[in-house]
């Protein structure tokens, strides 16, 4: 197979030193750094629909649209020779030309737009809409926005597939949690909260991509990744390929898997990706407890849903994990444990050998390939042109709504961290006529996209947006992300700044510091940038700082510097990011987003190892995430300012008929029509009247937190149970916000991983400031809402 020899040579060279070591750097062959190592897996395009009208398959059951998807898939797989079966166990499936089955590429990306597609050089199919990164989109606190973005991505993906340039499945969304701020891929996630944010994002994104809850036909097939406990790339040489994450049963149930439960049980995702890392000694892709007991038996994963390994993760079961004695056994262990498709070469390279050695059966292989094709059948792969999505074309990609939504998402996602009143800027009739735009993000284009992006239709940098405004703009870079371009760049920037009425410094971090396979070593502002910002502040001119990037940096020096008049977090705002930033600064739009991660002080990243997965405070670990952190953050999870003033008060309808006490047995005994489980029903509605008492129209966002001392210690500081966004609240007007507080959202996780509802006193509070507080009591005996299964491996390593 193309690329196989080179990957074997590289990985074999690592074998003597890599196996069994917990702190070792490995060649990382999953990303663009070494594309030649995985050339076959990286192939794009060339996908076509089977001919069910007159081709060899047309008279077989797989083309019978009246039959069940599983039966159709099983009939197809039964036609394959063993060699053909083996050749369809990897992400680059060869199909079976003998019977008219086309090749199929499983690896398609859609993190925040169509990517890893066969883009043309110009004209039709040369671009796709590039939305903000998920870390930014989630900050908007608008679940409808998430769904709309996913819906447009799926429409564009369908158009590319219909043109033979994409597939029917996508390796998205990434629903891991941004636990530690150094993680390079935190930008791909919805933030640090698992139960509310990551789970909500998973539900809205998956149902948007798939066309609804368990839609028939599926619009596209979403893949929930990376399952599970994956949130470190290469911190301190702890490679993601070989990390063995030590996670308590309590933390696994409470933090690292609830979003996968929602993805599987509620959103009905049809694919899940197992991750590179091991958890408690067992690699995820050979972990039958994860893939069978939890995912299928407990999380209610759809019957014919399939599991794909992350790219190369099956090989990693052997090297560097050393869980299997060789690559052939790693492949056998993984398929038997429940990894149906190998994004890699281990399955097709070794299943002939594994079959000969009786490590796998034909039935093992058929099970995995049948699951893949059953999902493709659900997506209309064998339905011919009668499938409702087959008429989507390039004209559907060229949609003004898509580009407008990309801008809207960017504008809604920008967080105002600090403002002494300088923002928004008034018109040029004021003293501000000339703006000096300085910094490594000032003329950002592809920087704004983060990672996993396709070519965008256009890129509006901050510089371009401001040049198109009413202000006179002078620009100089001043400094790059981590170094000065030359010895005079900072002095040139200072000269430029002195001649302007106002300074905007656009900096922060980008994919040179945080990305796949690369974590940060610290969470400080790059010293060269902080030095220049300090010098600019010393000029005494109005100064606005844009802090860009997915991960937070310690901005305490800027927060405390009175000469830094405003601080904005812009994340990775996508193709229209520059325009959105300019419009926020000039007051054409009003900020309303909130941080979905904690901004920690710099020493946080120095006092305990980033691979410590324990959330609760312990030893040098001061506690992780807003739920357990015992220190003082620079900016709290949920922080965000407005241009106007809002007052919030409890609505007369808040709660459930103003009850303040609920018996647990009575609550759980209620009929729950419209809900799968009684605990998914709201116990009460946290209803708040919000009035704009300022002079600017603005959206309003809010988070609802619960705190309690019910149940065993230690108790979390608080936890998020809901959020919402009100649009365009006019000055002097009021709107009502309703945040349902479900029974399940009040439960805690015990040491065995069970989700338990405890009797005691509870409070629901609005935002960090606790502007509105609703207190109530749960009475009676504690009740287990969700029973964590006993952990045992159904498949022993070979």
UniProtKB/Swiss-Prot annotation:
Catalytic function, reaction form: Hydrolysis of (1->4)-beta-D-xylans, to remove successive D-xylose residues from the non-reducing termini
Residues that carry a glycan: 23, 87, 142, 237, 326, 391, 404, 443, 480, 522, 618, 645, 658, 685, 707
Active site (catalytic residues): 310
EC number: 3.2.1.37
Compartment(s): Secreted
Disulfide bond positions: none
Superkingdom of the source species: Eukaryota
Any Gene Ontology CC annotation: extracellular region
Pathway: Glycan degradation; xylan degradation
Function: Xylan 1,4-beta-xylosidase involved in the hydrolysis of xylan, a major structural heterogeneous polysaccharide found in plant biomass representing the second most abundant polysaccharide in the biosphere, after cellulose.
Family: Belongs to the glycosyl hydrolase 3 family.
Protein name (Swiss-Prot/TrEMBL): Exo-1,4-beta-xylosidase xlnD
């Amino acid at each position: 197979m193309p690329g196989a020899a080179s990957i074997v040579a590289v990985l074999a060279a690592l074998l003597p030193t890599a196996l069994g070591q917990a702190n070792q750097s490995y060649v990382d062959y999953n990303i663009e750094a070494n594309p030649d190592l995985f050339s076959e897996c990286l192939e794009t395009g060339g996908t076509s629909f089977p001919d069910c009208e007159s081709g060899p398959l047309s008279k077989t059951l797989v083309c019978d649209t009246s039959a069940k998807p599983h039966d159709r898939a099983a009939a197809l797989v039964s036609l394959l020779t063993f060699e053909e079966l083996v050749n369809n166990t990897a992400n680059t499936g060869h199909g079976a030309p003998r019977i008219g089955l086309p090749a199929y590429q499983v690896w398609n990306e859609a993190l925040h737009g169509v990517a890893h597609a066969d883009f043309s050089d110009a004209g039709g199919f040369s671009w796709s809409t590039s939305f903000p990164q998920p870390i930014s989109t989630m900050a908007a606190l608008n679940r409808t926005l998430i769904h709309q973005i996913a819906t447009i991505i799926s429409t564009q993906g369908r158009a590319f597939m219909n043109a033979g340039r994409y597939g029917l499945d996508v390796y998205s969304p990434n629903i891991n949690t941004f636990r530690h701020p150094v993680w390079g891929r935190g930008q791909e996630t919805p933030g640090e909260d698992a139960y509310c944010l990551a789970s909500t994002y998973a539900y809205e994104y998956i149902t948007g991509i798939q066309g609804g809850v368990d839609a028939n036909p599926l619009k596209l097939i979403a893949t929930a990744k990376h399952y599970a406990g994956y949130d470190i790339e290469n911190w301190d040489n702890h490679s993601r390929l070989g990390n063995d994450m030590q996670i308590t049963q309590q933390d696994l149930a409470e933090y690292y898997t609830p979003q996968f439960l929602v993805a599987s049980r509620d959103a009905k995702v049809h694919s899940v990706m197992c991750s590179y890392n091991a958890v408690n000694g067992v690699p995820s892709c050979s972990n039958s407890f994860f893939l069978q007991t939890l995912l299928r038996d407990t999380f209610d994963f759809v019957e014919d849903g399939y599991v794909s390994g992350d790219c190369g993760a099956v090989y990693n079961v052997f090297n560097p994990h050393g869980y299997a004695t060789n690559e052939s056994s790693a492949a056998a262990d993984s398929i038997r444990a429940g990894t149906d498709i190998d994004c890699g070469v281990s399955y097709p390279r070794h299943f002939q050998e594994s079959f000969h050695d009786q490590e796998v059966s034909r039935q093992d292989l058929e099970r995995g390939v049948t699951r893949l094709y059953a999902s493709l059948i659900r997506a209309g792969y064998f339905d011919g042109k009668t499938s409702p999505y087959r008429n989507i074309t390039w004209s559907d990609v060229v949609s003004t709504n898509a580009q407008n939504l990309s801008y809207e998402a960017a504008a809604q996602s920008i967080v105002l961290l600090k403002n002494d009143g300088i923002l928004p800027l008034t018109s040029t009739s004021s003293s501000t006529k000339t703006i000096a735009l300085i910094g490594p993000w000032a003329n950002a284009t592809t920087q704004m996209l983060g990672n996993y992006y396709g070519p965008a239709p256009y890129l509006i940098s901050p510089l371009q947006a401001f040049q198109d405004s009413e202000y006179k703009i002078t620009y100089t870079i001043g400094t790059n992300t981590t170094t000065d371009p030359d010895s005079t760049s900072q002095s040139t920037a200072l000269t430029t700044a002195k001649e302007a009425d106002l300074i905007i410094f656009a900096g922060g971090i980008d994919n040179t510091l945080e990305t796949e396979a690369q974590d940060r070593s610290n969470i400080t502002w790059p010293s060269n940038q902080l030095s220049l910002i300090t010098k600019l502040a010393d000029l005494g001119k109005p100064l606005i700082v844009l802090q860009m990037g997915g991960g937070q940096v310690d901005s305490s020096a800027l927060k405390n510097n009175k000469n830094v008049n405003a601080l904005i977090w812009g994340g990775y705002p996508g193709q229209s990011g520059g325009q959105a930033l300019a419009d926020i600064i000039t007051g054409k739009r009003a900020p309303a987003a909130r941080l979905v991660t904690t901004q920690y002080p710099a020493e946080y990243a120095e006092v305990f190892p980033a691979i410590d997965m324990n959330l609760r405070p312990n030893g040098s670990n001061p506690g992780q995430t807003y739920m357990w952190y015992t220190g003082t953050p620079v900016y709290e999870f949920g922080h965000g300012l407005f241009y106007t003033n809002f007052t919030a008060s409890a609505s007369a309808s808040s709660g459930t008929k103003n009850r303040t006490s609920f018996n647990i047995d009575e609550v759980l005994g209620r009929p729950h029509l419209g809900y799968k489980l009684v605990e998914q029903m709201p116990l009460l509605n946290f209803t708040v009247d919000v009035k704009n008492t300022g002079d600017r129209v603005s959206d309003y966002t809010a988070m609802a937190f619960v705190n309690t001392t019910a149940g065993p210690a230690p108790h979390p500081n608080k936890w998020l149970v809901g959020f919402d966004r009100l649009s365009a609240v006019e000055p002097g007007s009021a709107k009502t916000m309703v945040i349902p507080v479900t029974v399940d959202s009040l439960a805690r996780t015990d040491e065995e991983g069970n989700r338990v509802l405890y009797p005691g006193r509870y409070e629901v509070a609005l935002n960090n400031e606790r502007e509105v507080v609703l207190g109530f009591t749960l009475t009676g005996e504690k009740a287990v809402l969700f029973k964590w299964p006993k952990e045992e491996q159904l498949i022993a390593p070979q």
